[in-house]
């Protein structure tokens, strides 16, 4: 029941083509491909900018001293 044979998928494909038509399916495929490409480009750009930030942060040092400011309040 959970697995479908190739004939089930071919019947579903024929029904989808009849309902939507090949032109509309082609446009959906192009839009989906463009979205995937845009996502990959965005991921690549964010990785590159992340490396730039790491290089900028890695060269700077900050000298600081921590102090304890815990106060006990008695009521």
Swiss-Prot record:
Q: Name one GO biological process term.
A: protein transport by the Tat complex
Keyword Transmembrane present in the record's keywords: the answer is: yes
* Residue span of region Disordered: 43-75
Comp. bias (Basic and acidic residues): 43-54, 66-75
Q: Which residues cross the membrane?
A: 1-21
Q: Where is it mainly found?
A: membrane
Membrane disposition: Single-pass membrane protein
Keywords for this entry?
Cell inner membrane, Cell membrane, Membrane, Protein transport, Translocation, Transmembrane, Transmembrane helix, Transport
Example GO CC term: the record gives: TAT protein transport complex
Listed InterPro entries: TatA/B/E, TatA/E
Q: Where in the cell is it found?
A: Cell inner membrane
Q: Please name the GO terms that the record assigns under molecular function.
A: protein transmembrane transporter activity
Decide whether keyword Nucleotide-binding is in the record.
no
Purpose: Part of the twin-arginine translocation (Tat) system that transports large folded proteins containing a characteristic twin-arginine motif in their signal peptide across membranes. TatA could form the protein-conducting channel of the Tat system.
For this chain, the family text in UniProt reads: Belongs to the TatA/E family.
Q: How does it assemble?
A: The Tat system comprises two distinct complexes: a TatABC complex, containing multiple copies of TatA, TatB and TatC subunits, and a separate TatA complex, containing only TatA subunits. Substrates initially bind to the TatABC complex, which probably triggers association of the separate TatA complex to form the active translocon.
Per its record, how is this protein called by name?
A: Sec-independent protein translocase protein TatA
User: Which organism does this sequence originate in?
Assistant: Aromatoleum aromaticum (strain DSM 19018 / LMG 30748 / EbN1) (Azoarcus sp. (strain EbN1))
Question: Species lineage, top-down?
Answer: Bacteria, Pseudomonadati, Pseudomonadota, Betaproteobacteria, Rhodocyclales
């Amino acid at each position: 029941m959970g697995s479908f044979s190739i004939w089930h998928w071919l019947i579903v494909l024929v029904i989808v083509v009849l309902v939507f038509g090949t032109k509309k399916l082609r446009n959906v495929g192009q839009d989906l491909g463009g979205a995937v490409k845009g996502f990959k480009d965005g991921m690549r750009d964010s990785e590159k900018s992340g490396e730039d930030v790491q290089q900028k942060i890695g060269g700077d040092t900050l000298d600081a001293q921590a102090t304890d400011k815990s106060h006990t309040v008695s009521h």
